[in-house]
């Protein structure tokens, strides 16, 4: 009887642990394919805000308004739902609130396929608060040791030496690639778990001089699937 009781307690604890580790998944149906994003529980403010916007249909119809080959693809500006040809989007002036930064470096970094919040620059936003709605998906590139040394020098200049790459972080960028120069400065709140080929396809499209795709690429529908 005692063994059964102990086993029942063990099962209950294991079940609670799984529930705590369960992560929300959002599906983005784009006109280039389907992308699934898992949201990190380590960034609850960004997670909950993103889920609310998805439930409200905020992202349905928005453009990928900024695409840079070998770097990232950016979306989330609701003004782009009725985009004018050639117009620049993403300045964020209409946004009604910001999200406090939830930067967890070096545990969470800008490895390839990461999802991070866009924001205003440090000059106007020293607290590095995030945009209420705009986000980007990291593509980046792979690095060797010499390249990572250069990236560390860049980080030192931009952060006053406060962001240092650990051996584990360097290994991530050597193995998977990404954008290390953004680490410690932007909130990474999720990652792509399906549809990497779609992200790769989008980051290769032709763009104008302002990094807007020549042919509009949209999120047709965003839904919570888990």
Regions found by a protein language model. Give the residues of each.
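Positively charged n-region of N-terminal signal peptides that target proteins for export
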Residues: 1-4
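Hydrophobic h-region of N-terminal signal peptides that target proteins for export
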Residues: 7-19
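Cyclophilin-like peptidyl-prolyl cis-trans isomerases
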Residues: 17-226
């Amino acid at each position: 009887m005692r063994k059964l009781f102990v086993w029942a307690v063990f099962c209950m604890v294991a079940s609670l642990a799984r529930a705590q580790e369960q992560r929300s998944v959002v599906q983005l149906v784009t006109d280039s394919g389907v992308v699934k994003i898992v949201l990190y529980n380590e960034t609850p403010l960004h997670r909950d805000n993103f889920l609310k916007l998805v439930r409200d249909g905020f992202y349905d119809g928005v453009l990928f308004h900024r695409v840079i080959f070998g770097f990232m693809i950016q979306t989330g500006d609701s003004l782009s739902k009725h985009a004018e040809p050639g117009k620049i989007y993403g300045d964020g002036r209409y946004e009604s609130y910001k999200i406090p930064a939830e930067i967890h470096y070096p545990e969470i970094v800008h490895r390839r396929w990461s999802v991070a919040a866009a924001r205003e620059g440090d000059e106007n936003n020293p607290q590095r608060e995030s945009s209420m709605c705009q986000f980007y998906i990291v593509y980046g590139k792979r690095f060797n040791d010499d390249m990572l040394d250069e990236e560390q020098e860049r980080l030192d200049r931009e952060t006053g030496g406060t962001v240092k790459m650990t051996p584990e972080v360097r290994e991530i960028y050597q193995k998977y690639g990404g954008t290390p120069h953004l680490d410690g400065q932007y909130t990474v709140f999720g990652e792509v778990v399906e549809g990497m080929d779609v992200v790769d396809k989008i980051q290769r499209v032709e763009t104008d001089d302002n990094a807007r795709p020549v042919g509009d690429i949209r999120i047709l529908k965003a839904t919570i699937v888990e």
